[in-house]
Amino acid sequence: MFSHKFICGSLTKMTETGITFDPPVYEQRYCATIQILEDARWKDQIKKVVEFGCAEMRFFQLMRRIETIEHIGLVDIDKSLLMRNLTSVNPLVSDYIRSRASPLKVQILQGNVADSSEELRDTDAVIAIELIEHVYDDVLAKIPVNIFGFMQPKLVVFSTPNSDFNVIFTRFNPLLPNGFRHEDHKFEWSRDEFKNWCLGIVEKYPNYMFSLTGVGNPPKEYESVGPVSQIAIFVRKDMLEMQLVNPLVSKPNIDKESIPYKLIHTVEYPFYVDTRTEKEKLWTEVQIELQRFKRQFESSEIEEGTYQDTCNMPIAFLLDRLEHVGATKERIEELLLENNLTVENECVLIVSSDQESEWSDPYKFSDRSSQDDALVDQEQEEERWDQGPES
């Protein structure tokens, strides 16, 4: 067995009238799944991720921020749902201004989680958040065959409701007529039932190990019921530096009864490969800080009605601004002298606007300059997403 501990904090509060989770359970599920994908034991080896049951593609908005992921497949059987939400995967304006350091291809696919299809080959990680409880037994039986037999990913994450927790929910509201939390649920498993399902998978596919966890902690004095949502993490043994029991099949056959997936939408994100040396990167940052200091100096001159041909920027000030990129006093002074700038009395001499030299516009030397601050508000405005699915 292996373990995984979440760093997401949460608070569960139960009163006489109800129970609340902060943050909401759906956000806790997303946070937990992102942390699983970013686990240092396998993060760098997860390049292609497939999410089954992607629905409104809310989880994608978080997953796309993982720079090591280069291919995301979003799969759902509901074509109309995919069509209504397909534009949500398109790059934002900020993605063009501050592009990724690696490529990202996104495909929206209509298909059944039980069907094997060419688009699923070479998948490194599979995500199925609150999916399995929505399928009938015949589909449920085929899911392990498709994922662990055909896809053979390095990492698989399933989440599903924990029926043990329903004893708390029913203190305040009855379950739905079907006996579950949601009208489309076909079943809700206890922790033992979920564990038995997982044990059956690793017995049939011994190349995998699993760990059980969950989100949505129970209130105090009810710890015995477990979390609202239970999570199974399956990891292929070679990701844990263990020997595989069986060799991987190089190109598994597609089930003849499977219906091929239909590609609904595809998009490729802009990316920028920075080929500059560390020295060139630091020089660009130095130029940006010199330009910023000069503009501030000239603005103060205009306000005071005084004009000078030069201004002096303290090396200490420059160092303070650039320590976060690994700058040292020696490296800064070396760069300044190499680029014919004058250093006197622990200051660099900056010429006025009418005497500008070629270093005056650092942006023409770099397409990827420091623009983070200017983008924060824009990204927040573009990436707001509303309340998610039920807990």
UniProtKB/Swiss-Prot annotation:
UniProt signal peptide: none
Protein's UniProt keywords contain Thylakoid: no
GO BP: piRNA processing; primary piRNA processing; RNA methylation; secondary piRNA processing; siRNA processing; transposable element silencing
GO molecular function: metal ion binding; O-methyltransferase activity; RNA binding; RNA methyltransferase activity; small RNA 2'-O-methyltransferase activity
Annotated residues for binding of Mg(2+): E130, E133, H134, H185
Names of the cofactor(s): Mg(2+)
SUPFAM superfamilies to which the protein is assigned, alphabetical: S-adenosyl-L-methionine-dependent methyltransferases
Acidic residues bias locations: 374-384
Keyword S-adenosyl-L-methionine: yes
Note describing how the cofactor binds: Binds 1 Mg(2+) ion per subunit.
Assigned keywords, A-Z: Magnesium, Metal-binding, Methyltransferase, RNA-binding, RNA-mediated gene silencing, S-adenosyl-L-methionine, Transferase
EC numbers on record: 2.1.1.386
Binding residues for S-adenosyl-L-methionine: D76
Disordered: region residues: 354-391
Family: Belongs to the methyltransferase superfamily. HEN1 family.
Function according to Swiss-Prot or TrEMBL: Methyltransferase that adds a 2'-O-methyl group at the 3'-end of selected small RNAs. Mediates 2'-O-methylation of piRNAs, single-stranded siRNAs and long hairpin RNA genes (hpRNAs). Methylation protects the 3'-end of small RNAs from tailing and trimming and could constitute a recognition signal for appropriate argonaute machineries.
Identification of the protein by name: Small RNA 2'-O-methyltransferase
Organism: Drosophila melanogaster (Fruit fly)
